[in-house]
Amino acid sequence: MAEVGKAEVRVDAFDKATGRTKYYEDLMPRDALYVRIKHATIAHGFVKSVDTSAAVKVLTCFDVPEHPFPTAGHPWSMDPGHQDVADRHLLNRHVRYYGDDVAVVIAENEVAAMQGVRALQVEYEELPFVLDVQKAMEPGAP
């Protein structure tokens, strides 16, 4: 406990106090676009449609080519026996969990991107789901 009660020397304090420290926003190019993702509001189902009329142009799961990609914890392999994420895409028509990504709004600023996401109206075909691991392993479980 030799550190308790001692003053901490902050090597970056002067630069922060004088405004010289570079933060994330300082490093953004002036013409950078902002992205916000629309997340599913159901636990399981399919996206039937996305009404983008309230936003100028929004990418949805129907606009993005179906190119599978590896996700964290799921390395991609050329071996067909090890391609367990062949149905995973950037945006998903098949919703597998609450919060799954279904659309992307790209805008000139963060506020417009957030407003665009809020304006999207997604219609779903809801499917049954289970919340219990044991029930999920039963034959015929969704």
Segments predicted by a language model, with ranges:
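Flexible, low-hydrophobicity surface segments
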Residues: 1-142
